[in-house]
């Protein structure tokens, strides 16, 4: 295989990268995903969210080492397995970070991460109906507040207000603190995972190839330049080459694992 870009991991980041890179029709992109397809009613259906979260087909089921401060208990570390990654198994809660958090990141040295820098990207990715000037309306990820018809919904918010907390009309605008309705990345009754919002449209263009069940062993180098990856599908080993870049987007646990197997970082 020879491609311009190889994206290792078809999760939340990998789906977006494949979409954006694939906007150039002259570029060929390979996406390698260790899990399978996200096309399943239990992934699509918001009310079934606990099923993929607790199914090894969709969740790697990782755990921490025993924690001394928790009486030796192991902590679950949910990691999405399959196209869309953790966006295919999470709770679909659409809540931006507080603007002051981003300002603090900038103050601590994370150049380019202040609120005014990240806001355009929040706006670019979302499609909100009836939102304010801080919201996006034409993005690929559909956002809504649900039906909100259960009387307990309003009772819970009213109880918070009665206890002295502010009422927030929308926690993704200026009033973050307090009680209010929560938005969800759900469109037409279906989970808006990164695979649905970004990868599927990219695949339809014809210049993005996706291989599922592809377990990447290591990155291949020519000197200090990454030139490809060594991976296996159904225990059959294969190699893929990239003329421009190899992108690791396999998550916070598996990306460094692949790097270590590739001879980068501290010895295992």
Language model: regions and residue ranges:
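Structural detector for helix-capping/boundary residues
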Residues: 10, 15, 116, 197, ...
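N-terminal glycine-rich phosphate/pyrophosphate-binding loop and immediately adjacent elements
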Residues: 1-123
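Glycine-rich loop(s) and the adjacent beta-strand/alpha-helix scaffold that form part
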Residues: 24-28, 35-40, 219, 229-268
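Alpha/beta-hydrolase superfamily serine-hydrolase fold, recognizing
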Residues: 9, 130, 205, 256-258
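Conserved redox-cofactor binding core of oxidoreductases
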Residues: 39, 107-226, 232
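Short, hydrophobic alpha-helix immediately C-terminal to the catalytic nucleophile
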Residues: 15-19, 196, 256, 260
């Amino acid at each position: 295989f020879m491609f311009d870009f190889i994206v290792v991991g078809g999760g939340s980041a990998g789906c977006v990268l494949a979409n954006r890179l694939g906007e150039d029709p002259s570029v060929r992109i390979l996406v390698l995903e260790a899990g399978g397809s996200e096309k399943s009613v239990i992934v699509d259906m918001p009310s079934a969210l606990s099923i993929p979260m607790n199914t090894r087909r969709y969740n790697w089921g990782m755990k921490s080492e025993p924690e001394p401060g928790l009486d030796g208990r192991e902590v679950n570390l949910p990691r999405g397995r399959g196209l869309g990654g953790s966006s295919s198994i999470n709770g679909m809660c659409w809540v931006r970070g507080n603007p002051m958090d981003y300002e603090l990141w900038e103050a601590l040295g994370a150049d380019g991460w202040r609120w005014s820098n990240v806001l355009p990207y929040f706006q670019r990715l979302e499609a909100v109906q009836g939102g304010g000037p801080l919201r996006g309306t034409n993005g690929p990820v559909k956002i809504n507040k649900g039906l909100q018809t259960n009387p307990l919904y309003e009772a819970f918010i009213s109880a918070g207000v009665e206890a002295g907390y502010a009422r927030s009309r929308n926690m993704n605008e200026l009033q973050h603190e307090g009680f209010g309705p929560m938005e969800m990345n759900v469109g037409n009754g279906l989970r808006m995972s990164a695979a649905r919002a970004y990868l599927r449209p990219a695949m339809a263009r014809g210049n993005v190839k996706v291989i599922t069940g592809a377990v990447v062993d290591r990155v291949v180098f020519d000197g200090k330049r990454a030139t490809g990856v060594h991976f296996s599908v159904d225990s059959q080993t294969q190699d893929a080459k990239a003329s421009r870049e190899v992108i690791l987007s396999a998550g916070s646990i598996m990306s460094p694992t692949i790097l270590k197997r590739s001879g980068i970082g501290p010895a295992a």
